[in-house]
Amino acid sequence: STDYRIETGDHDFVYGLPELNRRKICAANHVANPGCFATCIQLGVLPLAKHLMLNSELHVNAITGSTGAGVKPSGTSHFSWRNDNISIYKPFGHQHLAEIKQSLTSLQNSFRSEINFIPVRGNFSRGIFTTTYLDCKVGLDEIKRIYEEYYADHSFTFITDKNPDLKQVVNTNKCLIHLEKHNDKLLIISMIDNLLKGASGQAVHNMNLMFNLEEKVGLHLKPSAF
């Protein structure tokens, strides 16, 4: 539910993205779990926001499995429609954009850029694979250093030099991030399992923080063998 993800001043829910609000979550009475798309997209760009580097439009394409639609049956989640098929939905107007903008602005007060987000329905059951690109003149080595530094004390987000694929995160609570520079464009590839890091795994992570448990309790998950 998106009901308590946006700070409106009339509730005490903390936005439950540990890589952004770990300390606040530890002291919270109520936590609002982020959206799955919002989680994957934000993890790809939070380090840039912290260093005030989001100064151009963000172009985001993210493809999600059929379980991203929830448990309620629909025409676009039915196997016979989803199999060997692909389509976009809610282009430029997805409901997760509000929480993404809220988080980025909390780190970079000057952030006013457009987020051009195209969500895509994929022909697989679980996982989110996101590509984000933006203008950035900073060199790749420095960008990698910024990302490694930001996620150094976080247990589930990893920077990889190898071009990753979705099966490396399915059935885990991990997020993998891969960075590339193409002239003055920075390409960010991020991926999660929408049912774990994008939903129940993140809820368990938040619960562990709220109850002062080791944050990886119950989340030592291994990917399936493919």
Residue ranges and their predicted role:
Residues 46, 50, 102, 205, ...:
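Short, well-ordered alpha-helices that flank and scaffold nucleotide-derived cofactor binding pockets
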Residues 12, 34, 61, 123, ...:
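Short glycine- and Lys/Arg-enriched binding-loop motifs that mark or flank ligand-binding interfaces
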Residues 12, 36-43, 91-99, 142, ...:
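Conserved active-site and cofactor/substrate-binding residues in soluble primary-metabolism enzymes
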Residues 31, 146, 203:
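PAPS/PAP-binding and catalytic site of the sulfotransferase fold
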Residues 167-226:
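C-terminal helical cap and adjacent loop that interface with cofactors, partners, or active-site loops
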Residues 57, 62, 66-190:
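C-terminal substrate-binding/catalytic lobe of Rossmann-fold NAD(P)-dependent oxidoreductases
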